[in-house]
């Protein structure tokens, strides 16, 4: 599994410039896209996807063919890019003012740049919770593309972070699934005594540490405060829940991993393989990884694989029902003369039967459409994970995509420093505050 969060952190560094470049020379008051108008079923509709390459590319090709069959006077032109190439293609198209009618987006700062730049159509009337289209999706997925009370994005597939565990290892050690963070730490000694690495962890790429931190932030910091701290103009990063989270993270690294201070030299795939190979009892992972750890050849079986949310610390001040994760989806070009047709196409693309296809092999992308991920077309763990994501009170996006690049980089360095022991929690927070001040 490729760490998709790392793409926007590189891309987002240029996103503001891209949007400005795309806006340069355009009329001062471009007409707003009327996405709620009756679509005119003629002409060419352009769509920039992130499904380039086998097997994903067939998904939108099949949808385009079906839509063209239903509406013979419409030609759907697909621009299919990969996870690696999408950011450069978006840069080129935005700078040349050739942004397609529909285009891929991540959540967080990346999407916000297109929204604030006037390049994303307001879809509130069509897709807000309570609308016919919006009710197809979990509210948390829709909220990931919400800005100032308006809804801009069409969530396509979902993801979330959970602790995966080996049920047999827990049985061997005589421990139960923990319900608090302290209980999680308390399971580590008996698991190690039973011959397992309690929690496999690899942070060579930097972002895995941030996944622990962001989930702990969601638990320990009130949601309004956390959201305000994602914006440099309103951020303070001074709630005591941050320092508590950093301390809890250090405890987990020191007490529950065999790699300890050397975790920064371990790949996340090595940690993943430790759980799959039956050597580790737990590994903190994304829903998209679930089927990897029980794939053919793995020691860990689907029957022995279980998941649970990272347990909530006692006396936490945040949201105990929040799940860290983020959907990926699409925006409609606010300046497209075919905005209504674009909205109609995306309604077609997210109909339940197509959402079920997306969630099934060979695609295996858990659709954000509620009910699309079933026990029949998905593994038990994926089904459970996506159900939990859909029922979450909110999705808290990856720390390195929801913050601006300067702050994200400070957190990446801070996570590594906490692991190695080269900085204290307060020193890490000082560096984040300094980066935030520089980003204002």
Can you describe what each PLM-predicted range is?
Residues 1-46, 69, 430, 434-440:
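Short, low-complexity disordered leader/linker segments with a strong preference
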Residues 65, 69, 173, 254-257, ...:
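Extracytoplasmic/periplasmic substrate-recognition and gating elements
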Residues 66-136, 168, 172-179, 273, ...:
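Extracytoplasmic "Venus flytrap"/periplasmic binding protein-like
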Residues 100-101, 133-168, 197-201, 318-323, ...:
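A structural signal for short loop-to-beta-strand junctions that line the ligand-binding cleft
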Residues 108-161, 185, 212, 241, ...:
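Hinge/lid segment of periplasmic solute-binding proteins
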Residues 152-156, 161, 185-235, 280:
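Extracytoplasmic/periplasmic solute-binding protein
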Residues 190, 231-263:
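Glycine-centered hinge/linker elements that transmit conformational signals in sensory
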Residues 364-371, 383-436:
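C-terminal capping/gating helix-and-loop segments adjacent to ligand/active sites or protein-protein/ligand interfaces
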């Amino acid at each position: 599994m490729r760490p998709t969060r790392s793409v926007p952190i590189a891309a987002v560094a240029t996103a503001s410039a891209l949007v400005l470049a795309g806006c340069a020379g355009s009329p001062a008051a471009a007409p707003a896209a009327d996405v709620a108008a009756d679509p005119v079923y003629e002409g060419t509709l352009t769509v920039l996807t992130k499904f380039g390459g086998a097997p994903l590319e067939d998904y939108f090709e099949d949808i385009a063919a079906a839509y063209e069959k239903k509406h013979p006077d419409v030609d759907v032109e697909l621009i299919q890019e990969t996870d690696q190439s999408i950011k450069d293609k978006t840069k080129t198209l935005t700078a040349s003012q050739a942004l397609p009618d529909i285009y891929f987006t991540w959540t967080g700062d990346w999407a916000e740049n297109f929204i604030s730049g006037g390049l994303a159509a307001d879809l509130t009337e069509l897709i807000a919770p309570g609308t016919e289209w919006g009710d197809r999706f979990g509210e948390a997925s829709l909220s990931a593309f919400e800005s100032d009370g308006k809804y801009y994005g069409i969530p396509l597939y979902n993801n979330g972070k959970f602790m995966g565990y080996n049920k047999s290892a827990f049985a061997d050690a005589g421990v139960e699934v923990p319900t608090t963070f302290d209980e999680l730490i308390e399971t580590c000694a008996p698991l190690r005594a039973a011959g397992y690495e309690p929690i496999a962890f690899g942070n060579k790429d930097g972002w895995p540490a941030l996944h622990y931190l962001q989930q702990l932030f969601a638990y320990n910091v009130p949601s309004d405060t956390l959201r305000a701290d994602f914006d440099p103009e309103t951020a303070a990063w001074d709630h005591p829940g941050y320092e508590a989270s950093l301390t809890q993270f250090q405890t987990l690294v020191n007490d529950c991993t065999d790699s300890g201070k050397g975790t920064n030299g371990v790949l996340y795939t090595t940690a993943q393989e430790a759980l799959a190979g039956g050597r580790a009892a737990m590994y903190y992972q994304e829903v998209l990884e679930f089927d990897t750890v029980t794939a053919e050849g793995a020691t860990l079986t689907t029957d022995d694989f279980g998941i649970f949310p990272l347990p909530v610390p006692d006396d936490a001040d945040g949201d105990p029902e929040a799940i860290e994760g983020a959907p990926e989806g699409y925006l409609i070009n606010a300046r497209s003369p075919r905005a209504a047709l674009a909205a109609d196409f995306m309604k077609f693309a997210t109909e339940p039967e197509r959402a079920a296809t997306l969630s099934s092999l060979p695609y295996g992308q858990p659709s954000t459409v509620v009910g699309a991920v079933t026990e029949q077309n998905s593994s038990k763990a994926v089904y459970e994970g996506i159900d939990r994501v859909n029922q979450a009170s909110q999705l808290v996006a990856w720390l390195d995509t929801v913050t601006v690049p300067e702050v994200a980089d400070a957190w990446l360095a801070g996570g590594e420093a906490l692991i190695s022991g080269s900085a204290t929690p307060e020193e890490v927070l000082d560096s984040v505050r300094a980066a935030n001040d520089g980003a204002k």
